[in-house]
């Protein structure tokens, strides 16, 4: 379990980790690295290209909650973006995340 997160977030992340290959999610090790990097750097603004199901966005959002920052995340597929938005809501980070429909080239 991820002791620094609430029970709901822990459960959501564990469920999303089961779909890591299907949704091309980053590994937990990478997620923890990014989380710590954002907190240590006191980042205020982060852009993520490739929202997928929201796994990495949850980690980034939780870190940015600590620093008072915000995340903009971009996803091409509507279905994945909708799933990510639901996961952001469940994990309490939707208020600092701006999800956008688009691709990396635009």
Give the role of each language-model region.
Residues 1-106:
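A short alpha-helical cap/connector motif
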């Amino acid at each position: 379990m991820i002791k620094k997160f609430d029970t709901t977030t822990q459960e959501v992340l564990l469920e999303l980790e089961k779909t890591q290959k299907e949704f091309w999610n980053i590994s937990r090790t990478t997620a923890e690295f990014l989380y710590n990097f954002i907190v240590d750097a006191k980042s205020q603004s982060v852009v993520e290209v490739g929202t997928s199901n929201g796994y990495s966005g949850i980690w980034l959002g939780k870190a940015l909650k600590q620093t008072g920052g915000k995340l903009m995340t971009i996803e091409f597929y509507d279905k994945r973006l909708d799933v990510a938005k639901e996961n952001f809501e469940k994990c309490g980070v939707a208020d600092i995340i701006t999800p956008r429909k688009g691709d990396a080239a635009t």
